[in-house]
From Swiss-Prot:
It is found in: Cytoplasm. A divalent metal cation binds at D22, E23, D114. PANTHER family: RIBONUCLEASE H2 SUBUNIT A (PTHR10954), RIBONUCLEASE HII (PTHR10954:SF18). The keyword Nuclease applies. Residues 16-217 form the RNase H type-2 domain. GO terms for cellular component: cytoplasm; ribonuclease H2 complex. This is Ribonuclease HII. Its cofactor is Mn(2+); Mg(2+). PROSITE patterns: RNASE_H_2. The keyword Transcription regulation does not apply. It comes from Colwellia psychrerythraea (strain 34H / ATCC BAA-681) (Vibrio psychroerythus). Endonuclease that specifically degrades the RNA of RNA-DNA hybrids. One of its GO terms (molecular function) is manganese ion binding. The gene is rnhB. Its main location: cytoplasm.
Length: 217
């Protein structure tokens, strides 16, 4: 049995205002990839922040409300299924992360991103008086478990996307979106074959392309 990899405590960069960024929804066959950026208030701490996947749905929902109430700033960013099909899921995710940071009403001077790569984040030209000035950034492997700002971002992104799937389920209950959240489960694949491909599906993803007859090895 392989031993579980242990990551050291994260050493924060020297910065005045740090934003954490995470994504949810790279794997599903349907809907936007959703990202979030969060700047926490050190004078208004939030207990229980951790990787959103390790929290119950009830706890995630409560923490999402608390994060939005207590954070200095938070923002959601998205990339549509059409953008995913055009750019591919990696580049669409990077675009959504950029949109999340751009949506913050306070500009950070450092951005920490979950994972092993991060996009380029540009300063607001009107504030910096310099075009194409980059915001410092760093990718953090397992950041959603090691960096509280990223944990907070993972929580509000997860809650936002799950709510979107619940809303989609009300429009198309025959697909079971509230249950599988768009992921390629056996049930979901059966429903696609039975009912067809909606406009909100990612047509470049293999299981969807196979149903459409557009997939080629």
């Amino acid at each position: 049995m392989a031993s579980k990899q242990i990551f050291p405590d994260f050493e924060y960069p020297i910065a005045y205002c740090i934003a954490g960024v995470d994504e949810v929804g790279r794997g599903p066959l349907v809907g936007d990839v959703v990202t979030a950026a969060v700047i926490l208030d050190p004078d208004n701490p939030i207990e229980g922040l951790m990787d959103s996947k390790k929290l119950s749905e009830k706890k995630r929902n409560l923490l999402s409300l608390e994060i939005k109430e207590k954070a200095i700033s938070w923002s959601l960013g998205r990339a549509s299924p059409q953008e995913i099909d055009t750019l591919n899921i990696l580049h669409a995710t990077m675009l959504a992360m950029q949109r999340a940071v751009e949506g913050l009403n306070v500009e950070p001077d450092f951005v920490l991103v979950d994972g092993n790569r991060c996009p380029t984040f540009l300063c607001n030209a009107s504030e910096s008086n310099q075009q194409n000035l980059k915001i410092a950034s760093q990718a953090v492997v397992k950041g959603d478990a090691r960096v509280t700002e990223i944990s907070a971002a993972s929580i509000i992104a997860k809650v936002a996307r799950d709510n979107e799937m619940i809303a989609l389920d009300k429009l198309h209950p025959e697909y079971g979106f509230a249950k599988h959240k768009g992921y390629p489960t056996k049930l979901h694949l059966e429903k696609i074959i039975e009912h067809g491909v909606l406009d909100c599906y990612r047509q470049s993803f293999k299981p969807v392309a196979r149903v459409l007859g557009t997939y080629h090895d």
